Amino acid sequence: SQASSGTPRHGGDGTVRVVRPQVSSLVFTGGTLTIDSDKGEITHSDGSFLLGQFSNKTYTAGDGTAYPYQVVTYTADTISLGSGVIINLIGDNPISLRTRNHGNLTLGSTINVNGGNDPSNVGGSGTAGGFDGGAKDVDGNGPGRGATKSVNSQGGGAAFGGQGKDLDLSYSQTYATAELSNHLIGGSGGGGGDAYGGGAGGGAVELFAHGD
């Protein structure tokens, strides 16, 4: 046999999991806090670390089109982010920041989830659940997407809680709910025009303090 002949037999590739200690609260007055909604991680420049939980969701538009998405929920005893904290939110998924055990949630800094502008005719990039804008001469993305070259060769505005500007009623329509109570989903992307791409829709962030 192979074993008796002295020929070594190697096992299959394994995996190594390194578990970092997590904080139970997010309380910071300064430094940089990075929220990565693709990895499901929050990291602070002082080394603090917290993992989120992914939830699979699907929004079905009025025309029957399904839009699957994921929400990342980060839960801590207390969340307090002072004005000196620089918050960087990266990744495609919308996020929910929640407290537990009747913990307080205080936000003194800014979480920017603005949709990106078109950099070079390819359409702006969305973050935190915002849909990408359409490239030059291409419709935007999302349930309330803007049409390409809608008015005077310019791209049509997209929608979410309010209707965007478009003469074609199959575009730029409102969807979900403005208060994000049913679906934590971002805004749609604008349509590309004759000369430029469309801007991306804004992202979605939920702040939830556990009640008494």
Locations of the language-model features?
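Glycine-centric low-complexity/flexibility signal
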Residues: S1-V71, T78, N93-S96, H102-D212
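Structural recognition of beta-strand segments within beta-rich domains
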Residues: L81, I87-I90
